[in-house]
Structure formats: C-alpha cells, structure tokens
C-alpha cells in the first residue's frame, strides 16, 4: 500500500512538472500565436470521413480535419494512434503498403486526391516529405539538392546552381555548406543531414511540407535549429508535423490535432489545446498521464 502511494505521488509530481513546463512554453508563445483569424486563411487540406485499413486493422476512423495554409499543424498522440499513417495518406505514400484500403475523401486545394485521374506524381511534387531519420542520398550535397529538379527536366547548370543556393539558404544551412557542396552528404552531422533533406525538399518548390518526427534523432542544439527553421518556412509553406514532444508542439505549431486509437480526439488552436483542452483524454495525454 505504501509503495502504491509513493508511485501515485511520483506520477502526480511528474504530471504537474510536465504541465508547468508546457504552460510556460504556451505562455511565452502567446504573442506568436496571435495571428490573423482562421477565416482569412485558405484550407490547403480537407479530410472528410476518412477511414483506412491495413488488411483487417482499422487504423484511421472517420477522420475529419481541415488544415490551413501557412500554418504549422502538429499531429500528436501515443504510439500506434495513426499519426504517421495519416500524414503518409496526405501524399498517398501509404499506398506503398499492398494491404491498404481507404474510404472517404482528402481534398488538396479542393481536388480529391483519391480520384482515379489524380496524378500521384504531381501530388508528391506539391507535397514534400521529411522523415524521422535523416536520409540523404549517398551523393554530394550538390547532387542531393539537384536530384529533384533534374528529375523534372532541369539541366541548365546556372539554374541548378541557383536552386542549390536558394534551397540551402531556405534551410538555413548555406553558410555552413557553401564551400563543401561537392563533398558527400554522409559526412555531415545528423542535424546538418536533416537540414540538407529539408533543402532537397524545398528544391522542387512544394506547397506543403510533411514532417514525420523530424527532430527525434537529433541532439538538442540541432533540434532547436530545425524548430527555428520550421517557423521561418511557414511564411511560404504549409507544414504538417508529427511529434511526440509536447513542448515542441507547443513551441512551433499554430494548430494541434490529438489522435487517439485512430480517431481525431481533439483539434484546435495550439494555445487552447495545451492551456484549456476540451477533452479529458487530451488533458491526460499532454500532462503525461499516459502515452
């Protein structure tokens, strides 16, 4: 009985500390999130009654979610709740799994991406993706950045040079790498590799950037740099980011969707989610009571 009481006190202490830490982040970001009203922003993605199955496993259930342009939208939730599956559905990469079946609609710029004649190639050009582990190609930094443009038919050396500089500047890493463009990207640190992957994504000028836990494999300094970069990128791109880090979601996002057991349990302004959630399960998750 004594051990049980000790554990309960430890859990309560941990919960209070987690909530206090997140509240501090939310409070410090209050001005940042005081932006134009949602009514002035266009919907870039509208998910309507989406269900998804892996074979007989019902992984996503009745997802309804409108994602606004030039926002950072955080997708949070415990492992196995459908976060990564959802964002991989947004560019149809999930269909690389043979057993996948979907029902419902996802409208990207008012067009249903599941329509028979909708081009997956065009979708993946417009919607870039950055993965959990940095995954540069085993090529030079220059060749990593120019891979996409060359695939799209750009051959002019001067234009490619301009794309490389613009993309690396966009990823806030040009000054670090401008004298190393022809060295292998594998020789970079993890944080540098991830920013090169972001630059590679920017090189094809996407409209939306999907990020699947982009800092989980990085050290704290590299994580901070990527978070600062995300804040800069949202001026020109719409960013949807999966994260397990509650403080990170509170720091960088404008909207937050909490997924639980394949459902969207709650979706609202990030400040609202972390300071005054409407649902008890949301409150329990962000305060560390489960997950």
Swiss-Prot record:
<comment type="similarity">
    <text>Belongs to the ABC transporter superfamily. Phosphate importer (TC 3.A.1.7) family.</text>
</comment>
<keyword id="KW-0592">Phosphate transport</keyword>
<dbReference type="GO" id="GO:0005886">
    <property type="term" value="C:plasma membrane"/>
</dbReference>
<feature type="compositionally biased region" description="Basic and acidic residues">
    <location>
        <begin position="30"/>
        <end position="40"/>
    </location>
</feature>
<dbReference type="InterPro" id="IPR003593">
    <property type="entry name" value="AAA+_ATPase"/>
</dbReference>
<keyword id="KW-0067">ATP-binding</keyword>
<dbReference type="InterPro" id="IPR027417">
    <property type="entry name" value="P-loop_NTPase"/>
</dbReference>
<keyword id="KW-0813">Transport</keyword>
<dbReference type="GO" id="GO:0005524">
    <property type="term" value="F:ATP binding"/>
</dbReference>
<feature type="region of interest" description="Disordered">
    <location>
        <begin position="1"/>
        <end position="40"/>
    </location>
</feature>
<feature type="compositionally biased region" description="Basic and acidic residues">
    <location>
        <begin position="1"/>
        <end position="17"/>
    </location>
</feature>
<dbReference type="InterPro" id="IPR005670">
    <property type="entry name" value="PstB-like"/>
</dbReference>
<keyword id="KW-1003">Cell membrane</keyword>
<dbReference type="InterPro" id="IPR003439">
    <property type="entry name" value="ABC_transporter-like_ATP-bd"/>
</dbReference>
<dbReference type="Pfam" id="PF00005">
    <property type="entry name" value="ABC_tran"/>
</dbReference>
<keyword id="KW-0472">Membrane</keyword>
<dbReference type="InterPro" id="IPR017871">
    <property type="entry name" value="ABC_transporter-like_CS"/>
</dbReference>
<comment type="function">
    <text>Part of the ABC transporter complex PstSACB involved in phosphate import. Responsible for energy coupling to the transport system.</text>
</comment>
<dbReference type="GO" id="GO:0015415">
    <property type="term" value="F:ATPase-coupled phosphate ion transmembrane transporter activity"/>
</dbReference>
<comment type="subunit">
    <text>The complex is composed of two ATP-binding proteins (PstB), two transmembrane proteins (PstC and PstA) and a solute-binding protein (PstS).</text>
</comment>
<protein>
    <recommendedName>
        <fullName>Phosphate import ATP-binding protein PstB</fullName>
        <ecNumber>7.3.2.1</ecNumber>
    </recommendedName>
</protein>
<feature type="domain" description="ABC transporter">
    <location>
        <begin position="45"/>
        <end position="286"/>
    </location>
</feature>
<keyword id="KW-1278">Translocase</keyword>
<feature type="binding site">
    <location>
        <begin position="77"/>
        <end position="84"/>
    </location>
    <ligand>
        <name>ATP</name>
    </ligand>
</feature>
<dbReference type="GO" id="GO:0016887">
    <property type="term" value="F:ATP hydrolysis activity"/>
</dbReference>
<feature type="compositionally biased region" description="Polar residues">
    <location>
        <begin position="18"/>
        <end position="29"/>
    </location>
</feature>
<dbReference type="GO" id="GO:0035435">
    <property type="term" value="P:phosphate ion transmembrane transport"/>
</dbReference>
<keyword id="KW-0547">Nucleotide-binding</keyword>
